[in-house]
UniProtKB/Swiss-Prot annotation:
The active site is at D67 (proton acceptor). InterPro entries: UDG_fam1, Ura-DNA_Glyclase_AS, Uracil-DNA_glycosylase-like, Uracil-DNA_glycosylase-like_sf. This is Uracil-DNA glycosylase 2. Its main location: cytoplasm. The lineage of its organism: Bacteria, Bacillati, Actinomycetota, Actinomycetes, Kitasatosporales. One of its GO terms (cellular component) is cytoplasm. It comes from Streptomyces avermitilis (strain ATCC 31267 / DSM 46492 / JCM 5070 / NBRC 14893 / NCIMB 12804 / NRRL 8165 / MA-4680). Its EC number is 3.2.2.27.
Length: 227
């Protein structure tokens, strides 16, 4: 089964045209060739996991990441998130530290962010696959065009949303978003390289204030312990 067959129904209506584009055919062939050569993450059935977890009509917040974790068993298709039982990565640890300082939420024993996705937080990486052990190895192969279409699809809905763009890479996507209609929360990336500027930026308060103003229930950022 090809990765495209996994595209969730709620997104198929707005992204179906992308699947017919020549670039997407080339991208699919590239990923299949990569899988034939060695491990590619996430597994085929989780490439579109972020879209499956947060249906198109339920997106309140879109958080943009860069590319998947490249270690075996780490990622599961949602940006910043790792499977239960996997050590919380540095950027996510910093996100948790900011949440604790800003909201008082306890730091959880896991990095599994599915509770956010189920509340309408689309955790989207710009690139949806990666070769084992090689960060950014599937950059520039076509995923960026596809995920730009995802961003545009959310931006083109009648309902406003909140877009979270941490770091220079994510902020390059600003031209895809009408800032008159939507709220964009910008700031430093939570990576250890830029965390000093990330800490104290209070993004979660900004997000929830905007979500409430847009007429939706604010996000409960608490991640339950799994231990």
């Amino acid at each position: 089964m090809t990765d495209t067959a996994m595209l969730p129904e709620s997104w198929r209506g707005v992204l179906g045209d992308e699947l017919q584009q020549p670039y997407f055919k080339e991208l699919t062939e590239f990923v299949e060739e990569e899988r034939a050569r060695g491990p590619v993450y996430p597994p085929r059935e989780e490439v579109f996991a972020a879209l499956a977890a947060t249906p198109y009509e339920r997106v309140k917040v879109l958080v943009l990441g860069q590319d998947p974790y490249h270690g075996e068993g780490q990622g599961h298709g949602l940006c910043f998130s790792v499977r239960p039982g996997v050590k919380t990565p540095p950027s996510l640890r910093n996100i948790y530290k900011e949440m604790k300082e800003e909201l008082g939420t306890p730091i959880p024993d896991n990095g599994y962010l599915m509770p956010w996705a189920e509340q309408g937080v689309l955790l989207l990486n710009a690139v949806l696959t990666v070769r084992s052990g090689e960060a950014n190895s599937h950059k520039g192969k076509g995923w960026e065009k596809f995920t730009d279409a995802v961003i545009r699809a959310v931006a083109d809905r009648p309902d406003p949303a909140v877009f979270v763009l941490w770091g220079n890479y994510a902020q390059k996507k600003l031209p895809l978003i009408d800032e008159e209609r939507h709220v964009v929360v910008k700031g430093a990336h939570p990576s250890p390289l830029s965390a000093k500027k990330f800490f104290g930026s209070r993004p979660f308060t900004q997000i929830n204030e905007a979500v409430a103003e847009q007429g939706h229930t604010p996000i409960d950022w608490t991640i339950p312990n799994l231990g």
